[in-house]
Amino acid sequence: MMKKNGAGTDSPLLSVKNLTVSFSRYDHGFNKYDLEVIHSLDVEVYPGEVVAVVGASGSGKSLLAHSVLGILPENATVKGEMAYMGQPLTCELQRKLRGRDMVLIPKSVEFLDTLMKVGRQVKGVRGTMEKVKSVFGRYGLPEEAEKMYPFQLSGGMARRVLISTAVMEAAKLIIADEPTPGLGADMAMETLSHFRELADDGCGVLLITHDIDLAFGIADRIAVFYGGTTVEVCPAGDFKKGKEALRH
């Protein structure tokens, strides 16, 4: 696999090898069985790069994010190897890093607390309002947005608020799970450009999306998922060269 990154390091920030995820289920006769939804999945993210994970709905993209962060439901079983900066990504390490070094930007703005003003949400426990003002300014959010509730934000503003939470935490790994639903083409591209900026600042970005055309605009590498596994991982430019540059 190509070691493409913007920080000049040969070590991946995130490494996922041979990941398998299954869920315990019960049939109509109450017999327990395991439903495997991800198998033999591989992906790496280096500092300073955007890796776009593309695939149709049901291909396992969001489950990859939840596996890395350790937020799968209790009936899930995870096998394989996951590492963060060379350390095995154990449950204990996931809890330590989640929301700090590793941040999820969810697909739905409903993750914002509807009863709390957004400035306070972005500030979190360790931040300051001065830093909130600075981050909001970076993403073109008006000062009055601090005092707004989520329902008062436009779709584009809400997306920028979610991105602001990652910047406030100075996260090293940002996992963006379908961050552009419901946005027009221009607003979607603007939203994704913020992830490109974060990668250029040294973050590793795992961008989960179904829109490969948008991914081309910012990604260093594309990982194609199909049927719960990785079928292709290559530089974004290889897709434009034609099928002779691809394995599949």
Identify the residue ranges that each predicted region occupies.
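ABC ATPase NBD coupling module
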Residues: 88-103, 239-242
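H-loop/switch region of ABC-family ATPase nucleotide-binding domains
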Residues: 209-210
